[in-house]
A protein has these predicted regions:
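Boundary regions of SH3-family modules and the immediately adjacent low-complexity/disordered segments
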Residues: 1-16, 66-99
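Substrate-binding surface in catalytic domains of secreted glycosidases
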Residues: 134-144, 190, 213-340
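Glycan-recognition patch characteristic of GH18 chitinases/ENGases
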Residues: 84-191
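Glycan-binding loop/region signatures in secreted carbohydrate-active enzymes
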Residues: 308, 313-380
Length: 407
């Protein structure tokens, strides 16, 4: 005995019909072809759909069918009746034009922020609904406030692509174990799918960072296995990655080409060029650095199509302090940038940012400012390289005027 496993895509049309009489199913579309099965009068068969046209597979008056036991062959089209479309094509409603996604981050232990106003220039939002746990479970933080958030977003025409993050887990070994086998990946995928269905959203943004370089291919396999499940839901899959060249666990843990080929969008996390571990002061996201990396993404190094790449940009900067040979910095939100009196702001044409530097009590202070001008220049890169869109990290760090630039 041979056991057959039948797999149908939930995103494809599914058609059934009934046999008008007891008859044979033929191997080929011909009366002289051998009989491979018998069906009875009134028995239901599914009509095989052509992969390209998504219409009934017909040949010279014959139609291709599948029995309930999984046998596929041909019967005369005139010998079946009561054709019915059980499930039509599931089409995903795509964003018209460029993606403009706003991340709305909040701790998994805090309620989802309340939003009431329409945000100009945004067509997708990514609240922090999902946090990865060490055993492959997902900590879901939605609640009543999250449900209201989804309603607010949809009422304003925004797609909702919540983020799944491993920020709080921050455990490379745990992520490695999750990616190690088909069974562990499938467990995580099932949890993701169920969480998305329960949340009633439009897609997901996968933001898994700080992984082992050795797990690069397994992570790609995870996304490859996840993608059809997301598409079967009629949803969008968005995957975040860092700049192409860097450390093993920050940059070299991603196969960007494979991820871009598999997902709907690949997000370049276009910030943290300099961070709290940097040994020299510098911008968080310089124009020159972003352009250099965009060229790597689109060029032969990564080979990614421009219509797959989203450039994410920061609504924050850093204030640097240099004293006694030591360098420290702190994050300053765009809306909280304050320029001391009597300090001259200059233009840095390399980073395309306003910049100031001054000395006080033996300490040198430096800041590359993120403002409407710097964001405007970064948006120029999106248009210049015909990227899929832009992303903004994150809501409530910005000045109100920046949304007019985004718009």
């Amino acid at each position: 005995n041979t056991n057959k496993l039948m797999v149908d895509s939930l995103s494809k049309k599914f058609v059934e019909a009934k046999s008008k009489s007891n008859q044979s199913i033929r191997y080929k579309a011909d009366f002289f072809s051998k009989s491979i099965a018998r069906i009875k009068k009134g028995e239901t068969v599914s009509i095989v759909q052509d992969f390209n046209s998504n219409e009934d597979t017909e040949l010279n008056g014959w139609v291709r069918v599948r029995t309930s036991s999984g046998i596929i062959g041909y019967v005369k089209k005139s010998s079946i009746k009561d054709r019915i479309v059980v499930r039509d094509n599931l089409t995903r409603e795509k964003i018209n034009g460029k993606v403009s996604i706003m991340w709305d981050y909040y701790s998994p232990y805090d309620p989802c922020p309340a939003r009431t106003d329409k945000i100009q220039g945004v067509n997708a939002v990514s609240p922090s609904f999902f946090e990865l746990m060490s055993n492959g479970d997902i900590k879901t933080n939605i609640g009543d406030s999250g449900k209201k958030y989804v309603t607010w977003a949809k009422n304003n025409g925004y797609k909702v692509w919540p983020t799944l993050s491993n920020t709080f887990l921050n455990n490379k070994d745990a992520v490695s174990k999750m990616m190690s086998t088909f069974e562990t990946r499938e467990y995580l995928i099932e949890n993701i799918v169920n969480s998305l269905i329960d949340a009633d959203v439009d897609g997901i943004n996968i933001d898994l960072e700080n992984m082992y370089k050795e797990d690069k291919d397994k992570y790609s396999r995870f996304i490859i296995e996840l993608a059809p499940r997301i598409r079967d839901l009629g949803m969008t899959l968005c995957v975040d990655v860092t700049e192409p060249d860097g450390s093993d666990t920050w940059s070299l843990c991603y196969d960007r080409h494979t991820l871009a080929e598999t997902a709907d969008y690949l997000v370049f996390i276009g910030y943290d060029q300099h961070n709290n571990s940097s040994k020299e002061a510098g911008t968080v996201a310089g124009y020159d650095w972003e352009e250099k990396n965009i060229k790597k993404f689109l060029g032969p190094q990564e080979g990614i199509s421009s219509d797959k790449l989203i450039l994410a940009m920061p609504f924050y900067t850093r204030l640097w302090r240099e004293s006694n040979g030591k360098i420290t910095s702190k994050v300053v939100n765009m809306k909280d940038v304050k320029i001391p009196s009597n300090v001259k702001v200059t233009w840095d044409d390399t980073t395309k940012q306003n910049y100031y530097e001054y000395e006080e009590n033996g300490t040198t202070y430096k800041m590359w400012i993120e403002d409407e001008t710097s964001i405007s220049n970064k948006l120029n890169l999106v248009n210049q390289y015909n990227l899929a869109g832009a992303g903004f990290w994150e809501k409530d760090r910005e000045t109100p005027d920046v949304w007019q630039v985004v718009k």
